[in-house]
Regions:
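Bacterial N-terminal signal peptides that target proteins for export
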Residues: 1-11
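C-terminal motif of bacterial Sec signal peptides marking the signal peptidase cleavage site
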Residues: 15-20
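A residue-level marker of the well-folded mature domains of exported/periplasmic proteins
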Residues: 2-4, 22-392
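A periodicity- and composition-biased signal for non-globular, repetitive helical segments
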Residues: 11-12, 97
Length: 392
């Protein structure tokens, strides 16, 4: 089985280069003199509050990319970073502490956007601005100032469309049978992924089983698959919709443990985790959705810097991504910056992109992206598979 922690390890080098703090309770400052001439005390500070550390991207990508960009554009302004480790109570305490310490802007990726009312109330009471980062805050009567994310319903559509195309190409002779694993119900993004995938697949496949990872854990996906394979057998399904790469790792492990060849059961993913891309190269995972987390994190850092200095204008390099209609969070239409996700497969078929043209071209895991993907220490077959796939 491929190492499911490789993505986090791969980007440690990036984190080191950008000088990000490794502690989930660290406070970073952004340099010695404010280019605007304003002191940190005069403009307040910014708090970056991320939801969990089960998914590798938050500590390995969002945090360092945000921190580096913030350092470069907001010199002299204090940045307070916290990770809630999937605890709503912890995140509330972190937000309240940040506000007490002088934060005037919260960049909040909520553990549970539907129950973030107390955080939003605390921010509102002190006139603190809130950027809803990656996950939309949908708590009743909550109106974050901005929402920055990807088009998350589009993510699900990309997953579903790619899976359907692959299943149809297999000439099964029957309507494809699909096992379906959604993301955490606490995460509004997971709801949007699910909606998009159902839009692409409903009426075109038979959904044999459908459930969700309660906390986005690989082990949760593996447990679901263990039960389902026992129930329906290896011939009872043709493919697997999985909301993210962590879940795909669990599906892969379950299939291998039950003697099911993953190459014969195409599955989806999301996040371009290193082990997932290695599975794609080896043919044991069909696709992933590549989201340029660096772009998302840097956009949030730029906007937070502008807001902490009192600007209401969108930084000029972000205007093209502003959604004209905004995104409705159930209370109001929230001003939104929505970025474009990409479907990635080994061959770029059916409207997808190749690993080489996206993840390699962007050096997503650092300057040694190719050597990490094609590491023979992970799987002796990877170098040859990379060569065959044009990953170089």
């Amino acid at each position: 089985m491929l190492n499911t922690k490789k993505f986090a390890i791969a980007i440690v080098a990036i984190a080191a280069v950008v000088g990000a703090c490794s502690s989930t309770t660290a406070t970073a400052t952004t340099g010695s003199g404010a280019s605007s001439g304003a002191s940190s005390a005069a403009v307040g500070s910014v708090a970056l509050l991320l939801p969990e550390n089960h998914t590798a991207r938050y500590e390995a990508a969002d945090k360092p990319f945000f921190t580096t960009k913030f350092n470069s554009v907001c010199s002299g302004v204090t940045l307070n970073y916290q990770n809630a480790a999937e605890s709503e109570a912890t995140q509330l305490s972190q937000a309240e502490a940040a506000i007490t310490a002088g934060a005037t802007v919260l960049v909040l990726d909520p553990v549970n956007g539907a129950t973030a009312t107390a955080i939003m109330s605390a921010a509102s009471a002190k006139n603190v601005k809130v950027i809803s980062y990656d996950r939309l805050i949908t708590a009743p009567n909550s109106t974050p100032d901005w929402y920055i994310s990807f088009d998350n319903e589009k993510v699900g559509e990309l997953q579903g469309t790619a899976l359907l195309a692959k299943l149809n190409s297999m000439n099964l002779g029957h309507t494809p049978n699909v096992l379906w694993i959604n993301g955490s119900p606490k995460d509004n993004n997971a709801t949007l992924f699910k909606q998009g995938a159902h839009t692409a697949l409903d009426g075109k496949v038979t959904i044999v089983k459908e459930d969700a990872m309660a906390n986005w854990l690989q082990s949760e996906a593996q447990t679901l698959m263990d039960g389902w394979i026992t129930s329906v057998g290896a011939t009872g399904f043709d493919g697997v919709y999985v909301a993210n790469d962590g879940g795909a790792a669990g599906v892969y492990a379950s299939e291998v443990a039950h003697g099911v060849d993953p190459k014969t059961k195409p599955m989806t993913g999301q996040d371009a985790a290193l082990d997932a891309v290695q599975r794609i190269v080896m043919g044991t995972q069909y696709m992933t959705v590549y989201k340029k987390v660096q772009t998302e994190a840097e956009a949030a850092a730029e906007l937070a810097c502008a807001m902490v200095k009192g600007s209401t204008a969108v930084p000029s390099d972000l205007t093209a991504s502003v959604s004209a209609a905004g995104v409705n969070n159930g209370t109001a239409s929230i001003k939104s910056i929505l970025l474009t996700p990409l479907a990635v497969t080994i061959d770029g078929s059916n409207g997808t992109q190749t690993v080489e043209a996206t993840i390699v071209a962007d050096q997503f895991y650092g300057a040694n992206t190719v050597s990490q993907i094609c590491d023979a220490k992970v799987d002796a077959g990877l170098p040859a598979a990379c060569t065959a796939a044009g990953v170089k």
